[in-house]
Amino acid sequence: MPDAILRLALPSPLRRLFDYRAPAGVRREQLQPGMRLRVPFGRREMIGILVEVTDTSEVPAEKLKPALALLDSTSPLPPALFKLCLWTAQYYQHSLGDTLNWALPVLLRQGELAEARQERFWSIAPGASVDDPRVARAPRQREALTTLAQHPHGVAHQLLSKLMLSKDSLDLLLAKGLVQVEIRRHAPGVRHEHWLAQPELPLNSEQRAAYEAIRAGFDSYHAFLLAGVTGSGKTEVYLQLIRETLEAGKQALVLIPEINLGPQTLARFEQRFNARIALLHSAVNDRERLEAWLAARDGEADIIIGTRSALFTPMKNPGLIIIDEEHDGSYKQQEGLRYHARDLALVRARQENIPIVLGSATPSLESLHNAYTGRYGLLRLNERAGGAKQPRFLRLDVKSRPLDSGISGPMQQAIGQTLANGQQVLVFLNRRGFAPTLLCHDCGWMSECSRCDARMTVHQRYGELRCHHCGNVERTPRQCPKCSKVDLRPVGAGTERAEERLAILFPDYPVLRVDRDSTSRKDAMNQLFATIQKGQPCILVGTQMLAKGHHFPRVTLVSILDADGGLFSGDFRASERMAQLIVQVAGRAGRAEEPGKVIIQTHLADHPLLVQLTEQGYFAFAEQALSERRAAGLPPFAHLALLRAEAHKPGQAEGFLDEACSEAERLLAELNLSGIELLGPVPAPMERRAGRYRAQLLLQATARAPLHRLLASWMLALEQMPSGRAVRWSLDVDPVDLY
């Protein structure tokens, strides 16, 4: 039998496989797809993933290098997840090695063993009691026994000191048979603390109908769009579906759009389930992430909660996938492997033959279209749970009105009245910082980023100008860099300025700012929300972070300071995003017994989009928007791919894209493909960013199959273009942002 040739995927942008001989002493029957091997690559070593074992290679036998070591006895990637990675790499036209690498926790990419760590766990012995007479006169032993009784799943040995548990006391208790020690998996990323304080809530008729419809499809793949107004009780439906999943001995994967939603989601699940819960997001350290990932793979975690990348978490017994706030743009990865977690979750659910639920009060137009055409089951929740009323909308025309740090007189009055009534106010402004720019009142100079076609934002608290696009930071000048005068004025308002002004206008009430700057410290978000949940009158000032799934029962007024930005954008998705944001922010008002009110400041109070959204609701807007998309031949009635390029010198990116466009036209003719339009190349909407000049070429197709046939051949050609070596380029399939 000829020597086995190993075809490996390496973590590189090269969209090809690499051939190696098996490591010394490794037999063919030991090998299986998904295993990791350490291999030589040029002057360094890399960790590759085995894709297949074959007998032939295009590389001459004498030039084939042996792999250095086999790192696994079995594949760390289950077959279903390996299959998903193969599909992902092909669909998004991405390197398979990079895709497989993306699916692995960082420590596995670095060669760590794919095995759970074992740890000694101390727990109270069966039948033992803290009232045992043998500890009546031993207070430290009694205290240790009481602590262990509060941790029914046991305490890891390394956590003894954290809980003030004495090893000597435990040894004495062990000798008395009152405690026990066992060796088992230690997974710090999996939570075992459960309060079980919250019983199931009764479902109303709409919730019950949705629950029963999804439950009826539990035996196989079914996709459901749970479209419920804010506060309609979607989460309660999720929880009862998960309970059904756990009772069947299966696991549930729940994706959330933001890290900041993790703690409150985890708390709700811990209150409800006596289950092992893994939390996976970018703030979890590498060790915790690996242990949680392995626990899910081995069936030792029942519920997996995470952000976008948690989609690649393996499950031994998959039973249900839930995508909360499915419309959220955070589910689209914007760098490297540019996948959409919602779309890939649908593929994974189909491959694993399990149900998937997409939930949102403001579904994406793509998901609504799929529901209207029968690809998803559409389940509507039109009433708020518990009898809460929908908020009332008021469009406040601010034309010709004076604005005090962006706040009109009528808005100030409404805020003051709400606070006087003992309630809370949410002030929404989707701009961080103190002001969008700094202006010289003498010569007209404005603070512009030296590396981007963008203005620097004033962050007054730190005395800095910051670019929110490239991260460039400069000290705020004392005098104009152009004319040397000192009359420099912040122009416009951001959350920092609104916070400062509101604190002056309402000195008797706390003003809490919630944005990326104010929540950058660890636990800052939890501390802010703990203050809000006390229910005392206060003002919340924040960006879209406040719009995502948070529950503020004492907020009865939502003040939207500027609703006009989304009405004048070149991005065809801007109006959809604006509508979703307004409805989501508005949904924070009146979620308990108090009715809510939403006041929208606008210079365009009669704009058809705002009128329709506030008077007829999101679904009326969505149906109108879908009609316009159909007429314009835009997604979801078309399929897009965007080729981006950037370079240090002007013209280089366009030069590469011109050549790429010519190659695409040649391939269209050669492959006899139709229904594909090439738009561009054109400069990017922000042409210069982080010191690079950017341009893009858009491909628009009426059908997906011919577009992907073109992309497969086109990418091979692009990788060979000499002009591509002078630029940084990437392909984005199904782009969400056309920036």
List PLM regions with ranges:
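Generic non-transmembrane alpha-helical segments
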Residues: E659-L671, L710-M721
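Accessory, non-ATPase domains that flank or precede helicase/AAA+ motor cores in DNA-metabolism machines
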Residues: M1-S360, S367, Y372-A388, A420, ...
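Small-residue-enriched segments and motifs
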Residues: D3-L8, Y20, G48, F393, ...
